[in-house]
Amino acid sequence: MKIDKSLLSGSTPMLILSLLSTQDMYGYEMVTELSRRSDDTFHLKEGTLYPLLHTMEKNNWVTSYNTQAPNGRERKYYRITPSGREQLAHKEEEWQLFSEKVSTVLGFGTI
C-alpha cells in the first residue's frame, strides 16, 4: 500500500534525527537506511532530504563534516547534536500522543 506523502512530510525530521541518533550518516545512506528500516514503505528523495538537512544544520540539530570515502571521493557526513537529541525526544513524545489520539478517534484498539 502506498502512503500519502503528506503523512510522511511532518515526521521526516524526526525520522532523520532518529537515524542520526544511532550513527553519523551521509545523505544517500540516510535515504537507503530509511527505506530499509521501513520495509521499503518510506522513500525519501534527495531533493527533499538535503534542504531538510540544511535547515536542521541551521537550527543546530545536526552538524556536518567531510571525510574521504574508501573510493577516494569526499563525502559529507551528518551528526546529531545535543540540541538535536532534545528535539528528537520532543518529536517522539509529540508523535506518541498524536498516534494515540488518531487511533482513538479511528476506534483502533477499542472493543
Task: Identify the residue ranges that each predicted region occupies.
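Short, Lys/Arg-enriched N-terminal segment that forms or immediately precedes the first helix
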Residues: M1-K5
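N-terminal helix-turn-helix DNA-binding core of bacterial DNA-binding proteins
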Residues: S6-T48
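Basic amphipathic alpha-helical segments that dock to polyanions
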Residues: L49-M56
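Accessory beta->alpha helical hairpin/"wing" motif in late/C-terminal subdomains of nucleic-acid enzymes
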Residues: I80-G84
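Amphipathic alpha-helical dimerization/coiled-coil segments
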Residues: E86-I111
